[in-house]
Amino acid sequence: MSDTTRTAPGGADTLLAPEPKDETPKQTFVLAETTVPVDPNADTSVRPFEFRASDEALTDLKRRIVATRWPSKELVDDATQGVQLATIQKLATYWANEYDWRKFEAQLNALPQFVTSIDGVDIHFIHVRSQHANALPLIITHGWPGSIVEELKIVGPLTDPAAHGGTEADAFDVIIPSMPGYGFSGKPTELGWDPVRIARAWATLMDRLGYGQFIASGGDWGDPVTEQLAVLFPDRVKAIHLNMPSAVPPEILTAMQTGTQPTGLAPEEQRAFEQLSFFFDKGLGYANEMRLRPQTLYALEDSPVGLAAWILDHDDESYKMIARLFDGENEGLSRDDVLDNITLYWLTETAVSSARLYWENKLAFFAPQGVNVPVVISAFPTELYQVPESWAKAAFPKMIYYQRHPKGGHFAAWEQPQSWTVDVRNGFRSLRD
């Protein structure tokens, strides 16, 4: 696919960019030679990129899966002791015998991908320009244990809405970067790459692509990055969209920390409090290890099944959904979707480098950050918490759109791409007037 030249309509020049000239030859990186793009000149060029895993890397992956040394079965009938043996063995069997990385690799390489060096780190990103002249530039940030994989289903509906149930007036230019230490981006070699620094890098990226003003979206770690974009660059960031917003009132955070029950909560607020309490009480094992000792996770770089189990253990609802997938059910994601993401972590050797973001972060997660630009909120029921509208209004005084959904969880754009896309179209439509 290639970018399409277009002319901005009158009055919309601040949200549209001229076409950059990509004259650098496309670079292909083979895992056996290098795992991330290398920029020997540390310049500011934007270089076309594609990835092809070596046959040797894929053979080694299968060998390691088959050679897994399994622990004994859990002593309970549920997942309270962690990822269940039967689930991870079903995943491993499918991964070794049926999964096809090359299929996903071809899908990824069909999209325009680039790398550019920002603040000493090569940043990989997908950049798909819409053919429609009114397209709004939208940068979308993933989280952990996600990646650019979780955003791919929304690229077509955003850039070519007329072909996906929308109208030309709903078009977006889409930029999907891999965070530093994730996927095909470089691994930082110095301290300091927290959400604030990543937000600054994203602003540099958008400037480098020619976008003076833009909108942004994110979930999981993409939420604080997106919020910091709005806090640091309110004149450039016209609005943001969040599906796991930092909107928990201080008194609720205090109640969770002290183990007390807040009073006077509406039903949806009580449910959100219970979701958060469960996560903080039962679901932070992975986060505590990565926050305190990310370098200790050597096993994740050596065992693909160990990596898969670690990723599956992120949150209870996502684990249950994935377990059902490998029992033969279909709930928005497929088995291949799950393994595309896990295999990307494996082939890029980013289990530890991605975990360091937890160690680097100094922001109070879930606490409002003082965002003062228009905000669009998507609230999904099996997210870590389904943010109540009352909390969202209090956290974001300029909230312009809120939608509560009956289905969907932590990986919103991946699990429910249609619902996610409708929110983005509807939420940002007023910016086009």
For each predicted feature, which ranges?
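Conserved hydrolase catalytic core segment
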Residues: P157, P161-H164, Y211-P262
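Conserved acidic catalytic loop of the alpha/beta-hydrolase fold
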Residues: V196-F214
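C-terminal subdomain of alpha/beta-hydrolase-fold enzymes, centered on the catalytic histidine
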Residues: D281, N288-D433
